[in-house]
């Protein structure tokens, strides 16, 4: 960790970056650190406890609009960065990405393609526990599945913590804030909560990198990640595309191919 701190201090002192986004110790686990001065860089940590996806801050202009930014990235953050780059949300010359390998050595990536190459050795995989939960849900009848999710949605208070924590929810104006017309009702009720989550999952189709930030952020413990990760598996099975990699062919939901399957049309 000392090598990472030394690297960050050097970057700040030499003026290579204006801000370093990383992790520090908090009162209840780790929390984001926004480091602009070298004298607080010794608060940086990067270990297995750093599970929240701090790549969410890379699309915040109030943080990144003042100059070059560095980020100390975990694997989920690296996948997010590649996905955001694919969606033209990041500028390569405005971002410096750091990581730490298994030997504690600091990796400074030269660009998004290098991150993409690095991630090839760490393919995106759903945990065995989540796979079992998804399989259990898929074995249910449609009516049983609907009853299960309506039960979960009845807990939702529409705080939008899932949206705030997701690094790929970066719309300047979310559909739930549009009131002309009112696509989704603003109050919390099982059916309108379900409308919101179905909309969110569809927007994540082919994009979710499986970081679990939505589940972690939910104060009611709703397993929202099972929706997006199940969709992620379906996209991989049907289109052969995994998110968190530079897909030159285009986004699966905005790209048409003449040979696309049409057997779902009745």
Question: What are these model-predicted stretches?
Answer:
Residues 1-155, 167:
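Iron-sulfur-associated redox domains of electron-transfer enzymes in respiratory
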Residues 77, 162, 223-224:
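Helix N-cap / loop-to-helix initiation motif
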Residues 79, 164, 216:
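Short alpha-helical basic/polar micro-motif
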Residues 154-174:
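Extended mid-to-C-terminal alpha-helical interaction segments
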Residues 133-153, 171-266:
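Ferredoxin-type iron-sulfur electron-transfer modules in oxidoreductases and energy-metabolism complexes
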Residues 27-34, 109, 161, 175, ...:
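Aromatic-enriched hydrophobic runs in primary sequence
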């Amino acid at each position: 960790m000392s090598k990472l701190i030394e690297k960050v201090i050097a970057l700040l002192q030499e003026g290579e970056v204006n801000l370093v986004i990383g992790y520090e110790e908090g009162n209840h686990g780790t929390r984001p650190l926004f480091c602009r001065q070298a004298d607080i860089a010794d608060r940086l940590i990067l270990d297995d406890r750093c599970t929240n996806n701090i790549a969410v801050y890379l699309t915040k202009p109030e943080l990144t609009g003042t100059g070059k930014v560095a980020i100390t990235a975990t694997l989920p953050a690296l996948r997010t960065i590649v996905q955001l780059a694919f969606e033209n949300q990041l500028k390569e010359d405005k971002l410096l990405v750091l990581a730490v390998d298994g030997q504690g050595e600091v990796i400074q990536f030269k660009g998004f393609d290098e991150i993409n190459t690095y991630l090839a050795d760490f393919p995106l995989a759903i945990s065995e526990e989540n796979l079992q939960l998804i399989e259990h849900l898929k074995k249910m009848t449609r009516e049983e599945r609907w009853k299960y999710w309506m039960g979960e949605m009845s807990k939702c208070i529409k705080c939008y913590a899932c949206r705030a924590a997701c690094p790929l929810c970066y719309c300047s104006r979310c559909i739930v804030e549009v009131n002309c017309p009112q696509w989704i009702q603003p109050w919390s009720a099982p059916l309108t909560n379900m409308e919101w989550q179905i909309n969110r999952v569809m927007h994540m189709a082919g994009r979710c990198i499986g970081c679990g930030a939505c589940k972690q952020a939910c104060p009611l413990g709703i397993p929202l990640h099972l929706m997006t990760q199940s969709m992620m598996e379906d996209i991989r099975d049907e289109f052969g595309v995994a998110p968190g990699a530079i897909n030159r062919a285009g986004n699966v939901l905005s790209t048409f191919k003449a040979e696309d399957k049409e057997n779902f049309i009745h």
